[in-house]
Structures are given as structure tokens and as C-alpha cells.
């Protein structure tokens, strides 16, 4: 027997009188079925179109009552299973049709031996089955979120561009230390200036190498990405929204050329006449191999 907690109230499953196909249901049969029905003794199952393939629930209780027209009606409490509920939700098996055993076990009385669920009932006045509320309140629905998998590629391109910008920022900070291209008047030791430049050049080289590796990884990952088979046709008139691999390579070549030029400049030393020791003088500075004595004026 179905142990489901879902049970209906009393619903009308038959009305005395003639059926739509010409058969007759007597009031006495309906009263006898209400009197004799015992699900512990014999359970009337719910059968789809009266076929014994699989049941769709059970009949729990019966009662018979007279209506205003003087007709006897048989009422039942039924317990549908999930299959019947799903069919009913789809608009199927909306009514019931009783199965009467006239002389049940030689008792001389009728017994409800089964109850069909159908869309074409023979008896009139049967209650339409409805196991759910079409307008249920308090339903919880998930929010639709569009996932754009191309966003990851855009983020990678943005990171590469940001890295390139940081390299040029370091480059310009070397060209203009402290925001000005002026020597430090309190520094008479040009070797210290060269040492600082070497350190800064080393930082630039590391930054360029790191950028080179990141760009290679970035575009090699894009090459390995498989394109969808049914790729939508791209519009030729649209302008590209990101930096191409060729543009990145051109920028990288430019940075490498600057790196080479700075290496050459960093290796230049102050020209000193042969055999004459270098004498440190105040207000004398070296610029690209030339000594400038600011004390003498210009």
C-alpha cells in the first residue's frame, strides 16, 4: 500500500444512474461499496485507463452521500503516487472510473476492486483531479547568469599591456631621475653615478626579459586554443579591440633596441689623457666623454 503522505480530500468518483455509454450504476451498489471497502482487506489501486501495467496510487477510504438531485454519489480519498502527479501536472488522467465487483467473494455485496484514472470517464459528476496549484507562491528560481569565456583572454591581454607600460615607466625614470635631467652638485664621484646607472640598467633588462616571457606565454596559449567548428563569420568592417601579436612583437623589438643602446652608453668612460693622473676638481663634471668646468663659465 502506498505510504505517501499526499492524500486528497473526498472526491466524487461515481454517480448513480446511467453512464455516458449506456450502462447503469445503482445507488445500492454505491452504498455497498462504501460499506464494505477495507484497504487492509483488499486495496483498490489506481490504474491508468484500467490497464494493469503499473499502478498510480491507492484508494484510502470511501463514503456514499445523496446530492441535491436525489442521486447517490460515491466519494473517495485517494493517495496518488509521483507518476500520477506528473501526468496530472501535464494535463493527463484528470478523472476517475470505478471498477465494481458485484458479488465480492460470494458476499452478495459489491466491492470497489479498482479505480481507473482516465480522460474519458463513463460516470457523470466525477471530480476533476488536480494535485498541484498552478500558481504556487513562494517558489524560488535561480538567476540566469551569462558566462563570457572570452573575458579571460581580455584579462590576459590587459595584464600584458600593463606589464609593457610598467617597463616604459621604468625606462623613463632612468632617463629622468627624480623628474629632472640634472647632475647632483654634491656628488664629485662620477663612478657612483655609473654604478647607479648599471643597477638601473640591470633592472630594465630584467623587466624586458620578464615581458618577453609573458608575451611568449600569452600568445602561445592563444595559439593552442581550439577554435569552435561553427565559428560565426566575423565582420570585416569592425575595428580590432585589442593589440595584435605583430604589434606586441614590434614593441618588444623597440624595447630590445633601447636596451642595447643603453648598454653601450653605460660602458662609456670619462676620457683621461695618457700618463696624467686624474685630479678631482670642484665644479667639474663629465658628460659623454667631455669635461665641463662650471667655474669658468660658458
Curated annotation (Swiss-Prot):
Compositionally biased residues, Basic and acidic residues: 223-239
Propeptide residues per the UniProt entry: 1-2
Record-linked InterPro entries: Capsid_scaffold_GpO
Residues annotated as transmembrane: none
Residues covered by region (Disordered): 223-243
Keywords: Hydrolase, Protease, Serine protease, Viral capsid assembly, Viral capsid maturation, Viral release from host cell
Its EC number(s): 3.4.21.-
Record site: Cleavage: 131-132
List of catalytic residues: 21, 50, 97
A molecular function GO annotation: serine-type peptidase activity
GO process annotations (BP): proteolysis; viral procapsid maturation
UniProt modification remark: Autocleaves itself into an N-terminal fragment containing the protease activity, that remains in the capsid following maturation.
Family under the similarity heading: Belongs to the P2likevirus scaffolding protein family.
Job of this protein: Scaffolding protein and protease involved in the icosahedric procapsid assembly. Coassembles with the capsid proteins to form the procapsid, in which the scaffolding protein is found within the external shell of icosahedrally arranged capsid protein subunits. In a subsequent step the scaffolding protein molecules are cleaved by the viral protease activity.
Protein name listed in UniProt: Capsid assembly scaffolding protein
Amino acid at each position: 500500500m502506498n505510504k505517501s503522505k499526499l492524500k486528497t480530500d473526498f472526491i466524487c468518483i461515481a454517480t448513480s444512474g446511467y453512464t455516458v455509454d449506456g450502462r447503469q450504476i445503482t445507488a445500492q451498489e454505491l452504498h455497498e461499496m462504501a460499506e464494505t471497502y477495507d484497504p487492509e482487506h483488499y486495496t483498490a489501486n489506481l490504474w491508468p485507463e484500467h490497464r494493469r501495467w503499473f499502478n498510480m496510487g491507492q484508494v484510502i477510504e470511501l463514503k456514499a452521500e445523496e446530492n441535491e438531485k436525489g442521486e447517490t454519489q460515491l466519494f473517495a480519498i485517494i493517495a496518488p503516487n509521483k507518476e500520477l502527479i506528473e501526468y496530472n501536472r501535464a494535463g493527463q488522467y484528470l478523472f476517475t472510473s470505478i471498477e465494481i465487483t458485484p458479488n465480492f467473494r460470494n458476499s452478495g455485496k459489491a466491492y470497489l476492486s479498482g479505480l481507473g484514472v482516465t480522460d474519458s470517464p463513463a460516470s457523470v459528476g466525477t471530480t476533476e483531479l488536480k494535485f498541484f496549484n498552478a500558481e504556487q507562491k513562494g517558489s524560488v528560481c535561480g538567476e540566469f547568469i551569462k558566462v563570457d569565456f572570452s573575458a579571460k583572454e581580455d584579462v590576459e591581454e590587459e595584464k600584458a599591456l600593463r606589464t609593457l607600460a610598467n617597463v616604459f615607466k621604468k625606462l623613463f625614470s632612468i632617463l629622468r631621475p627624480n623628474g629632472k635631467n640634472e647632475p647632483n652638485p654634491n656628488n664629485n664621484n662620477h663612478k657612483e653615478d655609473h654604478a647607479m646607472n648599471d643597477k638601473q640598467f640591470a633592472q630594465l633588462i630584467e623587466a624586458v626579459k620578464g615581458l618577453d616571457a609573458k608575451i611568449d606565454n600569452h600568445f602561445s596559449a592563444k595559439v593552442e586554443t581550439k577554435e569552435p567548428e561553427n565559428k560565426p563569420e566575423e565582420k570585416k568592417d569592425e575595428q580590432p579591440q585589442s593589440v595584435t601579436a605583430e604589434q606586441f612583437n614590434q614593441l618588444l623589438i623597440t624595447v630590445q633596441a633601447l636596451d642595447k643602446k643603453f648598454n653601450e652608453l653605460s660602458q662609456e668612460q670619462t676620457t683621461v689623457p695618457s700618463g696624467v693622473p686624474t685630479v678631482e676638481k670642484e665644479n667639474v663634471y663629465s658628460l659623454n666623454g667631455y669635461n665641463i668646468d662650471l667655474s669658468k663659465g660658458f
